A protein has these predicted regions:
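Short, glycine-rich nucleotide/cofactor-binding loops
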Residues: 6-20, 51-53
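Short, conserved beta-strand edge motifs with alternating hydrophobic and charged residues
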Residues: 7-8, 37-41, 48
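A glycine-rich helix N-cap at a beta->alpha junction
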Residues: 54-85
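Histidine-anchored nucleotide/phosphate-binding helix
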Residues: 19-34, 38
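Short internal beta-strands
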Residues: 36-41, 79-83
């Protein structure tokens, strides 16, 4: 069995809370020593667009989505986006 932990995020523009909490959980998994990736699918692929991610600010106790994403990536996390989902949305 793999030690990779995968968080799937399928919402961003319509429900920023889901994207925010997804990156909080993924970062916690990294902190526990798990190889961790985030898979962006359906509307979650909007998190891969910097301008869209910057609009997601859920407020305390959560940091803005862009900061959560940067922290996750800088800590060694990987982010993968669904190519067909991106294509459908013109990303």
């Amino acid at each position: 069995m793999s030690d990779t932990f995968c968080v799937t995020i399928n919402s961003c523009k319509e429900n920023g809370d889901k994207a925010t909490v997804g990156f909080v959980i993924a970062t916690a998994a990294l902190g526990s020593g798990k190889d961790t990736m985030v898979f962006l699918s359906t509307d979650g692929v909007w998190a891969a667009v910097k301008e869209e991610a910057a609009k997601v600010v859920e407020g305390g106790p959560f940091k803005p989505l862009t900061e959560l994403m940067e922290n996750f990536i800088n800590a060694g996390g990987r982010v993968v986006a669904c190519a067909p989902c991106c294509k459908k949305r013109g990303i």
